[in-house]
Amino acid sequence: MGFAQSDSLAITPPRRYPPSCDCFQGMIDLTPRLAYTYADAKSSHFAGLMLHNDCIACGGGFYAGVHFAGRDFHRVVPEVGAEFYHLLLGYGVSLSTEAITPRVGLSLFNLLRVDAGYAVPWAKAPLFKGFTLSIITDIRLLSYPLPL
């Protein structure tokens, strides 16, 4: 006595999100990140590291680093953040010792981004408050792959 195999009982692997991008293959990259931010007639330079999936088309990651600001860049403000991107659209949130900043922007495959955000300060004399504009680059040539 045998059983006929039905196509309706076929087991299919679960779909990944986002379904249009098959980038999650068990590797993450540690990448240097540089940025320039302007807000409230003040500017700063940012240097840090980004930990993200190994796809440049879509995905996301976390980063940490510091802003260097003020005359002769003596003011140092640490910051951590999370962001997500899909081709041309990027969005995220950053948290520093002085403010929280949600932001959205345009991304060129997460190699170069231009973000606009709004910094909500909690410090008495914050580096940023109000609207912000950032230019961000992840230096993918210096990426270091890490297995999950």
Task: List PLM regions with ranges.
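Bacterial Sec-dependent N-terminal signal peptides
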Residues: M1-A10
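Outer-membrane beta-barrel translocator/channel fold
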Residues: R16-P18, F24-F46, G65-E79, Y85-L148
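Compositionally biased, intrinsically disordered/low-complexity regions enriched for serine, proline
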Residues: A10-I11, D29
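Generic signal for short, ordered secondary-structure residues
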Residues: G2, A82-E83
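Extracytoplasmic strand-loop-helix segments at the start of, or within, the mature domains
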Residues: L49
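Surface-exposed, glycine- and small/polar-enriched segments that build interaction surfaces at terminal
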Residues: H52-G61
